[in-house]
Amino acid sequence: MAKKSKIARNEQRKVIVERYAAKRLELKKTLVDPNATDEAREAARLGLQKLPRNASPIRLRNRDQIDGRPRGTLQKFGISRVRFRDMAHRGELPGITKSSW
């Protein structure tokens, strides 16, 4: 079980990323636009730098949805590998069977 403060911080980051996503995308488009002037690119770069640090989606952490474990998360299921194995053995995941060959 992860610390509740770490889970809460990550949830707050999700909100901030969502809030600034449109503005961030607009600034990024200006940066890579070949028709943009140098002044526009410079303004876009400064605008990106002025955004909050937590507005970047790279700062989000994929966590287990059940207990918040930060590592070994299976994206398809949203749970950690440990929890996945445990739930699969108990038959709580429909369609998942232990492989055998």
Curated annotation (Swiss-Prot):
Keywords: Ribonucleoprotein, Ribosomal protein, RNA-binding, rRNA-binding. The keyword Ribosomal protein applies. One of its GO terms (cellular component) is small ribosomal subunit. Gene3D superfamilies: 1.10.287.1480. GO terms for biological process: translation. GO terms for molecular function: rRNA binding; structural constituent of ribosome. It holds the Pfam family Ribosomal_S14. Binds 16S rRNA, required for the assembly of 30S particles and may also be responsible for determining the conformation of the 16S rRNA at the A site. NCBIfam families: PRK08881.1. Belongs to the universal ribosomal protein uS14 family. Part of the 30S ribosomal subunit. Contacts proteins S3 and S10. This is Small ribosomal subunit protein uS14. It comes from Paenarthrobacter aurescens (strain TC1). The gene is rpsN.
